[in-house]
Amino acid sequence: MVIDEYTDRKTNLNLDVQAVYNANRYAKLVKKKERLQNWLDYYQLKFERHPGKRPIGRTGCLGFCGREVDQIDYYRARISELDKKLASERQRVLNDPKAVMPVAFVTFDSRWGAAVCAQTQQSKNPTQWLTDWAPEPRDVYWQNLAIPFFSLSIRKFLISIAVFALVFFYMIPIAFVQSLANLEGIEKVAPFLRPVIDVPVVKSFLQGFLPGLALKIFLYILPTVLMIMSKVEGYVSLSSLERRAASKYYYFMLVNVFLGSIIAGTAFEQLNAFFHQPPSQIPRTIGVAIPMKATFFMTYIMVDGWAGIANEILRVKPLVIYHLKNMFIVKTERDRERAMDPGSIGLAENLPSLQLYFLLGLVYAVVTPILLPFIIIFFAFAFLVYRHQIINVYNQEYESAAAFWPQVHSRIIASLLISHVTLFGLMSTMKAAYSTPLLIFLPLLTIWFHKYCKSRFEPAFRKYPLEEAMEKDNLERTSEPNLNLKSYLQNAYLHPIFHMFEQQQQEQQREEKVEVRIDKAQQHHHRQVEKEEEEEEESKSSQATTHYYHHHHEQTTTTTHHHYHQHEHMSHSHMGPSDTADSPSPPHFVYHYGVDP
């Protein structure tokens, strides 16, 4: 009813309105069927290659317990049962009014109409008819469209608390790792480790590479956790999920990697003095601590930055994961294609890392300039490597129209402010009392510039100009007067429930064709075995010699093989090229005449 009311209001502008269904349960059933179908394909191919032995297995945990069953019959029965549930669930989604969510995708016959609708208030009641730009079809995260609107604020509040706790939970192991740089403190706490620490190789390893390596291990699983948190918040597009996850990851790295490394290095030496000093002395303390951590950040750039770029171009991690999947998970060609999928570039993880290196470059440009060559080398190789990977390796999941740039601009401004505070603290340690107050103008000018850019240029990333929309509409009408937009856009935002149903029908037809091919081959195999047995009995009943009997049997076998291959060729030609393409290899079971399947 809500969608009909909206359609009545916008009849002169919109082309189509596509409702959003709460089909999350249906999608889970489809994924479950895909897993079962994959196992069925695996056992059918296995039996196709060795028809003399039916695949037998147990139904319990990982096939180690439970009753023994025929795997092909077992998975066919489970898929048949699941098909009934899918049909019932699909009918429920299409017929139940509660399954229709108060969300819809509206397509317009012009860019101007879409811009007016998306960027204006539709109702005098501010809580009704909320409109916004829809993400492109590839960018839609359909699962979160079913989340009620009133629960989004609660979810975001709870996730904010969880992120805050996560940041300070990770502070504990990172602080311990950074304290390893102070070997004298470790020797005081654990005197029995002194003989090991005094070894030159161990000492250089602990002071040089271990802190950076341990920090990288701690940060390895973090992007996945932050992406899950962003999904719980309820964002409805993949680009929004990656932007939120990238924002969380940047705050985490700023607090733990940058500030945490600096504070931990000094807090273990002067913990009480640091926390009991007045706030005016904190910039001075940080200004003293940051130059002392330059060596650590040099090793961190080499371990994480340089080695990370080399690992990116070599793709060692995806290569290892692919071979592990190929050994333990891959069963069919479909599994192999999924294992070989390179995925996307992962902006939620890579973008905050680049912003952290940019922060280090700005902070240490004045404090410790010797760190700048490490940063410059990293960005030079990163530009070449990531450019190559984006063009030739990774898949593009969506197009967000530079939606990430406002966040990147804000991070650059924040890095400038941190560098100003650091320089202010460093100058105060050098007793430059007359020149230090002049540095106050630097953060003020930076904040003014940020506000100016935000008010002037940010709307270009958030809104679509009506002038440009009108120009493109007129150009399109002139260059393509016969363009049928409705037929072009009618399935653009079609709910996945319909695509899944079509794929389900296609897979069912393919499964039936595979079963028919296997059954026909099995029937022909039985006929060939029976024919050989009859000919053998006739030969034994005759009065021929033994030598003649063997010669006659060889001729009969050769003729039988030739006849079977002719029949096989005719059968595949009749099924067409699509049927032969589904089979990864010819049916080798025709040569196993000894045992009945």
Positions of predicted regions on the chain:
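Intrinsic disorder/low-complexity segments
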Residues: 557-558
